[in-house]
Amino acid sequence: MPLKHYLLLLVSCQAWAAGLAYYGCPSECTCSRASQVECTGAQIVAMPSPLPWNAMSLQILNTHITELPEDKFLNISALIALKMEKNELANIMPGAFRNLGSLRHLSLANNKLKNLPVRLFQDVNNLETLLLSNNQLVQIQPAQFSQFSNLKELQLYGNNLEYIPEGVFDHLVGLTKLNLGNNGFTHLSPRVFQHLGNLQVLRLYENRLSDIPMGTFDALGNLQELALQENQIGTLSPGLFHNNRNLQRLYLSNNHISHLPPGIFMQLPHLNKLTLFGNSLKELSPGVFGPMPNLRELWLYNNHITSLPDNAFSHLNQLQVLILSHNQLSYISPGAFNGLTNLRELSLHTNALQDLDGNVFRSLANLRNVSLQNNRLRQLPGSIFANVNGLMTIQLQNNNLENLPLGIFDHLGNLCELRLYDNPWRCDSNILPLHDWLILNRARLGTDTLPVCSSPASVRGQSLVIINVNFPGPSVQGPETPEVSSYPDTSSYPDSTSISSTTEITRSTDDDYTDLNTIEPIDDRNTWGMTDAQSGLAIAAIVIGIIALACSLAACICCCCCKKRSQAVLMQMKAPNEC
């Protein structure tokens, strides 16, 4: 037979095989050449049939199917993945999955299932993933999962499970991920997880747990994530996590925890994220957080913490994000942040702080962003930022600040965002150095609200940045004198502006009574019709303008660069997406 006849025969066989392969694709479904079948739409009210015999992936989504009869999958024994989600499915017959021995992934999520037949899964003992989330299941039984020795992931969140029977997971020895979140159970047996030695992720969030029995997690030596947030937990047993040395993420937020037992976190060397926000903590004992050499994030906002003692976080030398906002902090010990040499984000806003020690940030050499807004700060020590040269963002808005020390920001070359608005700034002559610095660094104030004078009454409501430099003198009795002692050194602010303005403000009142007749008229006008003094003032004004323009341009460039570098880090200040 000639070669061309062989080729024609081969093509004919392939065409015949292809037609056989896709023969029987239901009209309401689409069948692809990759053995994938998808059936979607509200018009589907019963299981489509016949299904292609070679189907390996079947998706039935968003239909009005309410029941799954027996033997509907007998002719598709090669099926590997079955996804029946977002239907009206309320009843599944016991033999519905017969002949699906090759099935690896089964999802029945987002249906209306209340009960499952005990032997429903007996023919799919090779399953690796089983998703039963967001149904209305009220109970699960040990026999339902007895044949799943290969199961890796079991999702049961979003049901109405009132309790978890002891032994229900005993045969799931290969399970690595178990989600029981958003159910209604109130307690756990201490032995319910005793055979899950390979479990890596356990999620128990959004239940009504008030107590976790000692030993509940002892068998979970490979656990990496434990989610217990949004329960009603009031106390934690001291050794509750001692056998979970591989734990990396621990979520305890939005509970009723009022006290952390000493040593509760002592055996967690690999932990990198710990959330405790939304609890009732009143104090932090020194050493309660440690040693945890890999911890990167510690979230403590929205508690009732009133003070921070020395060395509260001294064992967390790799910590990068510390969130303490929305507490009742009124005192921070000078050594509270000892050991936090790698901290980059510190949130202290919305507390009751009135004063801060000048050394409180001295060990935070790598700090990039600090938020102090919404406190009651009356003043800041001049040295408070002395050792944090890399600061990019400082938020001081909505405090009780009337002035700031001379040169407090001068060494912060990377500073690109400074918030000072909503403070009662007192715009007398003492504010001049800050005023002059703000003029040269206006770009760092951003585009939102600028700081506004609160007093004296003559300048109330005027912007501290653009107000006329002829401020009223300080409110003292007697003749006005230069306020030299208020600032140890005037060299850190622009000399020309501050000196000329101060000279005008503090001019002796005797000048007003000088006998003009005793002064010899001197005509020292130059070629532009101005006196030498006038020429000097004009030149000085031009120089000041050029310097101010150059500094503002440099600040803008710095700000743009800083914001790009800090964007990824700033994103960490947002509340965490826990599970």
Curated annotation (Swiss-Prot):
Which locations, inside or outside the cell, does it occupy? Cell membrane
Which residue ranges does the record assign to the LRRCT domain? 423-473
Q: Which residues are glycosylated?
A: 75, 369
Statement: the UniProt record of this protein carries the keyword Membrane:
yes
Provide ranges: composition bias, Low complexity. Answer: 485-506
Q: Where are the LRR repeats?
A: 54-75, 78-99, 102-123, 126-147, 150-171, 174-195, 198-219, 222-243, 246-267, 270-291, 294-315, 318-339, 342-363, 366-387, 390-411
Query: What is a single molecular function from GO for this protein?
Result: collagen binding
Summarize the record's induction comment. In chodrocytes, expression is induced by IL1B.
Record membrane topology: Single-pass type I membrane protein
Which ranges make up the Cytoplasmic topological domains here?
Answer: 558-579
Q: Would you tell me the Gene Ontology cellular component terms?
A: apical plasma membrane; plasma membrane
Q: Extracellular side of the membrane: what ranges?
A: 22-536
Tell me where the signal peptide lies.
Answer: 1-21
Tissues where the protein occurs: Expressed in chodrocytes (at protein level).
Q: Which GO terms describe its biological process?
A: host-mediated suppression of symbiont invasion; negative regulation of protein localization to plasma membrane; positive regulation of cell migration; receptor-mediated virion attachment to host cell
The residues covered by the LRRNT domain are 22-53
**Annotated region described as Disordered, given as residue ranges:** 476-509
Q: Which PANTHER family match?
A: IG(IMMUNOGLOBULIN) AND LRR(LEUCINE RICH REPEAT) DOMAINS (PTHR24366), LEUCINE RICH REPEAT CONTAINING 53 (PTHR24366:SF96)
Q: What is this protein called?
A: Leucine-rich repeat-containing protein 15
Q: Which organism is it from?
A: Mus musculus (Mouse)
